[in-house]
Amino acid sequence: MDYDPRAHGARCDECPLKGKTVVPSEGQIDESGEGVALVGEAPGEMEEKLRRPFVGASGKELDHDLRVAGIRRRDTLVTNVLLCRPENNDLRVLIQDINRQNREAIEHAKANDLPVPPPVASPIDCCYPRLMNELRPYSNVITLGKTATRALTGSETSIMAIRGGLMVVDATSDQPQRSVMPTVHPAFVLRQMRWAHVFRNDLAKAGRWFRGETQWNPPKVTYHPDAATLAAFLSHHPWIASDLETDGIEPLTAKIRCVGVGTADEVMICGFLSKDGTTRFYSPGEERRVREVLCDFFTDPNCTKVGHNFGLYDRLVLESQWGVTPKPVVDTLILHKSAESELPHGLAYVASLYTEAPAWKSDRDGNKVSTFAENDEALHSYCALDVAIDARVLPPLVDAVNLRDQLDVWKLDQGMQAVCADMHAVGMFVDQARRLEEEKKLLKRRFVYL
């Protein structure tokens, strides 16, 4: 008997793809709630021909990477947000065309004083009830690409910003709480093979998470420690991860909201300026003492400061606001650039490779938490995670740099970062001629930071 999506809730009669070949979901329904579902965007040409999901080139890539990750395809439900193939495999163009038709229909109705006709339905909306009905028994889902991730989590965030970050979707009246691992689509991996190890890492992490084998433990956080407690903490470590949260993005004018310092397991957050722009977190005397402790720490030659973009943005803020230049510094952004120059270097991306941290950088509307945190508590918690994650990614990043024999490249890049920061500090755009001149000087000698 042919599979009928309407029996599972699909509104096929309203769908712009009505009459197209249906590619059914594949796999056994797992009523235990412990099974794994894989959700892509839509069938491709080969899938349409064979009426099976993920059997073309992207399907072969997926099968291989699932095996590497220890997940057996036959034990999963494999499906797509849409069960029918959009023309030229381009859902984006189809959605744009539907939106254009609806706008033109509204404009025509208004211009001719006619009733506004019912809008052309989105194929995603038409197939969504079917998808949710089929996924109801599954509490573990891997979403392949932005369309599937948005359908399962409601997130408007770029897939590149949240892939590899573990997400928990709350239960509703008719759906269970779900563990969701967003990652890129295997078709993207085929076009950009440098992402293959990232994709495999995401799948392997998902498997560990679903089996309860992940190793993520949030750090112990002390908020607004007094100066004595802070000084004692900072005196016990040869290197400390650091992060600043500010009220703006221009480092020469931004004011410091909070400073986070810590290790992989313990973080201290010193609040200075509330999001309301007025409230302080210490008495004037204690704030001065805490600030003095932090300034001594940032200039202590015997303690290395570790942070993401710390050698540029955070350095410029500290110079502008507190008159101190942090030294010595190891910038994890520069470290990762030296290890994998061809891939993104944001902390969320680096954390997704080297830790099992949950997604924390953006909310589900795609807003950066550092900018749009609802309150001071949320901002301080965000800062604490940044610090702990920076501390956790440092050892594997150093190993990656050494493995690729890129230590000299890192030293050069970090030296050039310092040159560019000096230019920015005096209000200059980066002078490329001078930058090149300084780069030639750096190539003639070796900088040692560790």
Which residue stretches match the model-derived regions?
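Mixed-charge, glycine-rich, non-catalytic linkers/tails in nucleic-acid processing enzymes
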Residues: 214-219, 326-335, 367-450
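A residue-level signal for conserved active-site and pocket-lining positions in enzyme catalytic cores
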Residues: 9, 141, 206, 243, ...
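Short strand-coil-strand connectors
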Residues: 170-176, 262-264, 426
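A polyanion-binding, active-site-adjacent surface
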Residues: 1-213
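Active-site flanking residues adjacent to catalytic metal/cofactor-binding acidic residues
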Residues: 39, 79, 184, 242, ...
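Conserved RNase H-like, two-metal-ion catalytic cores of nucleic-acid enzymes
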Residues: 46-47, 51-55, 62, 69, ...
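Short beta-strand-alpha-helix junction that forms the catalytic/metal-binding core
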Residues: 35, 181-185, 268, 304, ...
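Metal-dependent phosphoesterase core characteristic of DEDDh/y 3'-5' exonuclease domains
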Residues: 62, 153-165, 177-190, 262-264, ...
